[in-house]
Design a protein with these regions (language model features):
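Alpha-helical recognition segments enriched in aromatics with Gly/Pro capping
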Residues: 1-32, 47, 119-329
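N-terminal, positively charged nucleic-acid-binding surface of large information/translation enzymes
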Residues: 8-13, 17-105, 462-466
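Alpha-helix C-terminal capping/helix-coil junction sites
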Residues: 54, 100, 128-129, 257, ...
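Short phosphate-binding/catalytic loops that engage adenosine nucleotides
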Residues: 58, 132, 455
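Short, glycine/charge-rich beta-strand/loop segments that flank catalytic centers
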Residues: 66-70, 92-95, 105-120, 138-147
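The substrate-binding groove and active-site-proximal loops of carbohydrate-active enzymes
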Residues: 78-84, 108-114, 229
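Short Gly/Ser/Thr- and Asp/Glu-enriched loop/turn motifs at secondary-structure junctions
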Residues: 106, 136-138, 459-463
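Structural preference for alpha-helix termini/caps and helix-kink/transition segments
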Residues: 268-269, 275-469
């Protein structure tokens, strides 16, 4: 299995630190709003990487954080007149709903930055003790970039070039820094902002230290794969390497994976352009399996363009898979013959060739586009060779292969059983009773159960409205 490593800019054979186990960290979203389709790309891509590793027999410890303290969260909290914690917890729950809709498996651990402050203070103190960090008069703590001789190795940036650029960009209030390149590990509190007590001042951590600490706590000093969007390569991941390797005296991550940007109608997605699309908005038009298919139908390192036409194409393509699976299921249930014929045995063996093609694509830096091409070859094979005369065992064998490959991609080949309207109404009524009784855990369970069955709830003044995804 080969992975393109951003660190070396080449494909490398994947060799885990410990045989049969993979330690993987993926930078998660900053939770101040509903996630947008740009956030969705790394979630879907690296969930698929995880699924393939598990398919190959690896035990994957998959950690993905929520950044729940940030300027954007604080700004939103001030605008709404609520606490930053209320904002972050609200959008963590909304993010989990969207992840369930996209069939993104929950991480082994979803740490939250605000729950790991003690670890951050401890790592900063270690860096100070080693001479890699220093505090200034107002209590701000900075990392000494030039003391880490390998700084720039991930982004392949030259320190001298960075120096001139950063000197021009130095903002007011940072004149106490020893060097313009030095970045913040801890910052003093501001009026109305959340803060924690530290040896240097009451304040909060810098963004970069959060992931270094959460990765160390839940995965150890060294990990196999660190992943995220390509916008995180510099400065975030570069700074993570500096902090972690200077603190732990070990190589932080063996393989660095980054997905490319997503544009909308060939333009960068932004609120100012009015083309900002949330996953929730997409779910009102399409089953989120369609969004997942769309994301996987391109190589993760290639820029991806989102458009209505491409989503329609993805919807139609996904239907070809589900319709083929439906026909196979129907044939399995209705076939009069049960035993495989000699010809069918040969055809089943031939079908395994598509599994090999699928695996070859995935083992070449997780080429999901080519893996999907192998799935469609299997669909064509099934449509041609499974007929009304086919045995139940043959139809079942082909269906099992199709379902297996789709499951690795997080796609449901066989449509979920339709949930009846009465069942939905009964569950909504139970949820309302749970909320009245302040049993919010049960209410959330019911909501998630319905979401998993493709039912979206919307709480309104007139009561709870629901619709099928």
């Amino acid at each position: 299995m080969k992975i393109f490593n951003t660190l070396t800019r080449q494909k490398e054979e994947f060799v885990p630190l410990e045989e049969g186990k993979v330690k993987m960290y993926v930078c998660g979203p900053t939770v101040y709003n509903l996630i947008h389709i740009g956030n969705a790309r790394p979630m879907i891509i690296f969930d698929t990487v995880r699924r393939y590793l598990e398919y190959k027999g690896y035990e994957v410890n998959y950690v993905s954080n929520f950044t729940d303290v940030d300027d954007k969260i604080i700004k939103k909290a001030i605008e709404e007149g609520v606490s930053a914690e209320e904002i972050s917890q609200r959008y963590i729950e909304e993010c989990k709903k969207d992840m369930a809709g996209m069939n993104v498996k929950p991480a082994t651990t979803h740490p939250q930055a605000t729950q790991e402050i003690d670890g951050m203070i401890s790592m900063i103190q270690t860096l100070m003790d080693k001479g890699y960090a220093y505090a200034v008069a107002d209590g701000t703590v900075y990392f000494r970039v030039k003391k880490f001789k390998e700084y720039g190795k991930l982004s392949h940036k030259n320190l001298d070039d960075l120096q001139s650029g950063f000197r021009a960009l130095q903002v007011s209030g940072e004149d106490q820094k020893e060097d313009p390149l030095d970045f913040v590990l801890w910052k003093p509190k501001k009026e109305g902002e959340p803060y924690w007590t530290s040896p240097w001042c009451d304040g909060r951590p810098g963004w970069h230290i959060e992931c270094s600490v959460m990765s160390k706590k839940y995965l150890g000093d060294e990990i196999d794969i660190h992943a995220g969007g390509e916008d995180l390569i510099f400065p975030h991941h570069e700074n993570e390497i500096a902090q972690s390797e200077c603190c732990n005296d070990k190589i932080f991550a063996r393989y660095w994976m980054h997905n490319a940007f997503l544009n909308i109608d060939n333009r960068k997605m932004s609120k100012s352009l009015g083309n900002f699309r949330t996953v929730r908005e997409i779910s009102e038009q399409y089953d989120l399996q369609v969004l997942r298919f769309f994301m996987l139908n391109a190589h993760y390192r290639s820029p991806l363009n989102f458009s209505a036409d491409l989503m329609e194409s993805s919807k139609n393509a996904l239907e070809r898979i589900t319709e083929a699976a439906g026909r196979l299921k129907d044939r399995k249930e209705k076939a009069s013959a049960v035993e495989l014929t000699e010809a069918e045995e040969k055809l089943l063996a031939e079908a395994e060739g598509y599994v090999k093609k699928f695996e070859e694509a995935m083992e070449d830096d997780f080429n999901t586009a080519d893996a999907l091409a192998a799935v469609f070859e299997l669909v064509k094979f099934a449509n041609t060779n499974v007929t009304e005369e086919s045995s139940a065992t043959f139809a079942e064998g082909i269906l099992e292969i199709l379902v297996k490959l789709c499951d690795v991609l997080g796609l449901a080949a066989v449509k979920k059983e339709e949930i009846l309207d009465k069942e939905i109404e009964d569950l909504i009524a139970e949820r309302q009773e749970a909320r009245k009784a302040k049993n919010f855990a049960r209410a959330d369970e019911i909501r998630d159960e319905l979401l998993a069955k493709g039912i979206i709830l919307k709480d309104t003044r007139e009561g709870v409205k629901w619709k099928r995804a």
